Amino acid sequence: MVRIFLTGYMGAGKTTLGKAFARKLNVPFIDLDWYIEERFHKTVGELFTERGEAGFRELERNMLHEVAEFENVVISTGGGAPCFYDNMEFMNRTGKTVFLNVHPDVLFRRLRIAKQQRPILQGKEDDELMDFIIQALEKRAPFYTQAQYIFNADELEDRWQIESSVQRLQELLEL
């Protein structure tokens, strides 16, 4: 039985690598944010606005516990999920946890392109975006680094890099 949790900051490649890794292992892939949106028929942004951060984080925790009941699955968490309640401890207890570590410059490049799809980043100038990323990583590092495995996910720009990363991740997890 395998249950793998991919954690990391937004833009780290949790969904990109998670889908490819699940395909390689021939197991389902669950993106926790997508799962929440399907269950509640609202975007994460709408739920966050409607319930506030505390309400959203509680809902996220409950949904994390729900998806953790599935076996033989790759789960990507939201970027903040490991940082609240006992979520990181829970994931470490119920599966294999991987922190997708990405250099801030790489995150900046990825998120700069994807700003329109991420409401929290809209309207940020380049220098503000870089400061935002660095500050968030500093706050979240104590949680992310509790993962059982730390994996460099800087190179996910094309199919070959993704395939190579999947192979490296499979070797790291000894699967």
UniProtKB/Swiss-Prot annotation:
One of its GO terms (molecular function) is magnesium ion binding. Its cofactor is Mg(2+). Pathway: Metabolic intermediate biosynthesis; chorismate biosynthesis; chorismate from D-erythrose 4-phosphate and phosphoenolpyruvate: step 5/7. Substrate binds at residues 33, 57, 79, 140. It is found in: Cytoplasm. GO terms for cellular component: cytosol. It catalyses: shikimate + ATP = 3-phosphoshikimate + ADP + H(+). Binds 1 Mg(2+) ion per subunit. This is Shikimate kinase.
